[in-house]
Amino acid sequence: MKTLPVTLLFIVSILSFVPSAFAQKDLPADDASTAAFVELCKNPDDIEGRSFCFGFGEGVYQQYLASRAINAKPAICFANKTETRNEVLQKFLAWTKSNPQLNKDQAAKSLMRFFTQNYPCK
């Protein structure tokens, strides 16, 4: 029974030395634009930023699935099941460079455009 408090103390002490374990990134509160999203996502060494980007993109896609009418023809199909999240992100970053006119649009709107243009259902 004495090992439980010692174990908890050990875990708490480890976590106190790893503040980045709880670090978060988010889009700036006053800017949910495509440009702000790209800025957050483009650094491959920023683990928290990349994690946010993957989660945000997944959330946009899941919202699309949840809000699509059951009998509606799907507009987005990820046919290549071997493509990684990072590969999709790299395509998105390249796509935004080719479409700078969308930088002021909301990031979610640009992601939906990207998904429908690059992953259309056939």
Per-range role (PLM):
Residues M1-T7:
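Positively charged n-region of N-terminal signal peptides that target proteins for export
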Residues T7-F17:
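Bacterial N-terminal signal peptides
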Residues F17-K25:
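Sec/Tat signal peptide C-region and signal peptidase I cleavage site
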Residues D26-T34, T84, L102-Q106:
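Short, structural beta-strand-to-alpha-helix junction motif
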Residues D31-A94:
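Short N-proximal segments of mature Sec-exported proteins
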Residues R85-K122:
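Surface-exposed, polar helix/loop patches in the mature regions of secreted/periplasmic/lumenal proteins
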